[in-house]
């Protein structure tokens, strides 16, 4: 096994750990889930570039008669990238004391201001950061509003 294979195994393990955390562990942290809303995907171009570069590496490895283990590891990396960027849906998960957005826990008392833009983007102003929440279904904004009113 080469150093390249070890690095690929590390990247695959990191992506797998992230996918498992995002799908199974995060919804169970910080109490029961009150509301889970699907968000729009961001960075589709980045994902196409990533999977395309891995496909080029697979092609290069196959045409130069590289190790089969490396080809399989690159294929697994491409599949993990495809899952994370294209199949998995990003979510905002509301709990009793706060919410998870982009895998970061944010407590409700950190919200200083909330606005709704004309194109349906919920803007939450925190102390030093602004969150742009783009929901997949525009009707979910009303659910978020009701939940925040009940919990404040």
UniProtKB/Swiss-Prot annotation:
**Gene giving rise to this polypeptide:** yobD
Which compartments is it annotated to reside in? Cell inner membrane
Instruction: Indicate the secretion signal residues.
Output: none
* Organism this protein belongs to: Salmonella paratyphi B (strain ATCC BAA-1250 / SPB7)
Where does it primarily localize? Answer: membrane
Q: How does it sit in the membrane?
A: Multi-pass membrane protein
Any transmembrane segments, and where? 6-26, 45-65, 67-87
Q: Which InterPro entries match?
A: DUF986
Q: Which family does it belong to?
A: Belongs to the UPF0266 family.
One GO cellular component term: plasma membrane
Q: From the Swiss-Prot or TrEMBL record, give the protein name.
A: UPF0266 membrane protein YobD
Q: Which Pfam families does this entry report, sorted A to Z? A: DUF986
Which keywords does this Swiss-Prot/TrEMBL entry list? Answer: Cell inner membrane, Cell membrane, Membrane, Transmembrane, Transmembrane helix
Q: Which domain of life is it from?
A: Bacteria
